[in-house]
C-alpha cells in the first residue's frame, strides 16, 4: 500500500518541512468548514480540468472528508502520470481525531 499516508505520518512529514502539495478534493462548502493549513482546494469533479495546477514532480497528498473521494483522486492522478501521489487515510476527519482536534469535525 504505497499510495496511502496516515494522519500521523503526514503530520511528521509536515513538521520536518517536507515539500508536499496538499490537494483537498472536497466541495467548497466542506473546505470552508475545515481544512489543513496550506492545502489547495480542487473539488474532485473539477480535477480533470485542473491538472495544470499540479506538477508531476511534486509529492501530492489527496485529502477529503473520510478518504474515499481522495482515494479516487489518487487513482486518477496516478493514471494521469503523476507518480508520487498518496491518499490521506481517513481524511480530514481522521486528522481531527488523531492529530489536531482544533480542526472541526462535521
Model-identified regions with their sequence ranges:
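Rhodanese-like catalytic fold shared by cysteine-dependent sulfurtransferases
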Residues: 1-21, 28-59, 68-106
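Short, surface-exposed ligand- or partner-binding patches at beta-edge/loop junctions that are enriched
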Residues: 63
Amino acid at each position: 500500500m504505497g499510495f496511502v499516508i496516515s494522519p500521523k505520518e503526514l503530520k511528521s512529514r509536515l513538521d520536518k518541512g517536507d515539500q508536499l502539495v496538499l490537494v483537498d478534493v472536497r466541495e467548497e462548502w466542506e473546505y470552508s468548514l475545515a481544512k489543513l493549513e496550506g492545502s489547495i482546494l480542487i473539488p474532485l469533479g473539477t480535477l480533470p480540468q485542473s491538472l495544470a495546477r499540479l506538477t508531476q514532480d511534486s509529492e501530492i497528498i489527496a485529502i477529503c472528508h473520510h478518504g474515499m473521494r481522495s482515494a479516487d483522486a489518487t487513482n486518477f492522478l496516478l493514471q494521469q502520470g503523476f507518480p508520487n501521489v498518496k491518499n490521506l487515510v481517513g481524511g480530514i476527519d481522521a486528522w481531527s481525531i488523531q492529530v489536531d482536534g482544533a480542526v472541526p469535525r462535521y
